[in-house]
Amino acid sequence: MNGSDGRETRINSFALVSYLPGALAELLDEIRHDFAPESRAKAHVTILPPRPLLEYSGEAAAEAMEQLRVRLQEFPPFKVGLGDIEVFEGTQVIYVSIQNGFAELERMHAALNTGRVAFQEPYPYHPHVTIAQELASEDVHNAAQFARWRWSEFKHSRSVWIDRLTFVQNTLENYWTDLAMLNLGSPVAR
C-alpha cells in the first residue's frame, strides 16, 4: 500500500496485505512508479481489500487487529507464485496474476472477512498484485504491453512465502499507514 509519513489524517478505511520482498518488490514498485510517479505504494497482495470498520474508533481497530491475529493462527505460511501481467476488463486495472497459492488466498480471505472486518466488497475477491490503475482507457493496452515487457526481463524468483500480513489504515491523502504486522500460524518445512 502507499507508505505514510504519519502526518496525514487517518480515516475509516482498513485493509490486510502481504508486502512482497526483495528484488521482486523492487521491480514491481518500479513498474508501478512508471505509471504513477507520485505513488508511495509498496508491492503487495491484498488479502482483505479496503473496507470501513463498523463503529469506527481506536478501540474498534484494536479489536479488529486482535480478531485477525487469532484467526491467522489457523493458517500456516504458504508459498505464492506470481504469473502473467493481465488486465481486469471492467476496471482496466493492470495486475500480476497469482499462479500458485490462489486457492489459499481465497480461503484466507473467506475466513477473515468476518466479525469486525466483515464487508460486502464491490467485486468478487481475486488475489493479484496491482501494477497500474486509473489510466485513461486508450492508454491501458500500451501500458499493459510495457508492463509485460518489463516483467519478462525479470530473471529472479517470482515466488514468495506468505508468513505475515500487515493491517493498514488509509488517510484522507490516500496514503496507507502500517498498523500491525500479524504472523500466520506454525511454519511448515520449506
Model-derived features: positions:
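Basic, often amphipathic N-terminal segments
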Residues: M1-K79, V87, G101-H156, R164, ...
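Short, exposed beta-strand-loop hairpins at the edges of beta-sheets
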Residues: Q169-T171
